[in-house]
Amino acid sequence: MATNQEAGRHQEVGHKSLLQSDALYQYILETSVYPREPESMKELRELTAQHPWNIMTTSADEGQFLNMLLKLINAKNTMEIGVYTGYSLLATALALPDDGKILAMDINKENYELGLPVIQKAGVAHKIDFKEGPALPVLDQMIEDGKYHGSFDFIFVDADKDNYLNYHKRLIDLVKVGGIIGYDNTLWNGSVVAPPDAPLRKYVRYYRDFVLELNKALAADPRIEICMLPVGDGITLCRRLS
């Protein structure tokens, strides 16, 4: 019989891995992710697993990937749209220098406050500027101000899929040339290759066309170069060229 810990991990496998083999994904987690996961991220991951909406969280392997990516590009000024309890936010904050900054936006502050004590205990809360509410009005104001153009090293989007294209139209001006925008869930439970009559969950079917539209638009955007990776539920990295 599986232990509660094993059951929780396999639940993560079912929701967040696109690998055909659960055993292979479990091997990745057990071999290279969990043993190197910072204690604060482990604590927040386990706390989030008890939340009824835990399917919304970033997977542990994707958190590890984001943390390393931010270190590789020496990111200092970042943005995150869609925070939930803050697992990916914590991965980002831990990767930034002490004077690094994250503009974090989410419509639900209550979820963020669930993970905030862990973030505070990790000593990185001072890097985060959290704003509650829709992100689009904030982005529009930043663009209108003018001083934020090309100011962000990295932007991570894990929010309302039906607005991803609207985000992209604005974020391309806010990320610096050579900077990266990461869009999460771009393989959307694998539904991007599902036949029209496939039995999909209602929310998966609803957002599927928005994800497909985004993927098509990103592939055709000459202002960026892209790389779509099967990490977590799929993440597309967009490096701004001009």
Curated annotation (Swiss-Prot):
Cofactors demanded by this protein: a divalent metal cation
Tree of life domain: Eukaryota
Disulfide bonds: none
Known EC number: 2.1.1.104
Pathway: Aromatic compound metabolism; phenylpropanoid biosynthesis
Binding site for S-adenosyl-L-methionine: T58, E80, G82, V83, S88, D106, A135, D160
BP GO annotations: lignin biosynthetic process; methylation
Entry annotated with the keyword Methyltransferase: yes
Reactions that this protein is recorded to catalyse: (E)-caffeoyl-CoA + S-adenosyl-L-methionine = (E)-feruloyl-CoA + S-adenosyl-L-homocysteine + H(+)
Keywords of this entry: Lignin biosynthesis, Metal-binding, Methyltransferase, S-adenosyl-L-methionine, Transferase
Record text on cofactor binding: Binds 1 divalent metal cation per subunit.
PROSITE patterns referenced in this protein's UniProt entry, alphabetically: SAM_OMT_I
Keyword Isomerase included in the entry's annotation: no
A molecular-function term among this protein's GO annotations: caffeoyl-CoA O-methyltransferase activity
Record: residues binding substrate: K16, D158, N189
Class in the EC hierarchy, top level: transferase
InterPro entries xref list: Cation-dep_OMT (IPR050362), SAM-dependent_MTases_sf (IPR029063), SAM_O-MeTrfase (IPR002935)
Family listed: Belongs to the class I-like SAM-binding methyltransferase superfamily. Cation-dependent O-methyltransferase family. CCoAMT subfamily.
Summary of the function given for this chain in its UniProt record: Methylates caffeoyl-CoA to feruloyl-CoA and 5-hydroxyferuloyl-CoA to sinapoyl-CoA. Plays a role in the synthesis of feruloylated polysaccharides. Involved in the reinforcement of the plant cell wall. Also involved in the responding to wounding or pathogen challenge by the increased formation of cell wall-bound ferulic acid polymers.
Protein name: Caffeoyl-CoA O-methyltransferase
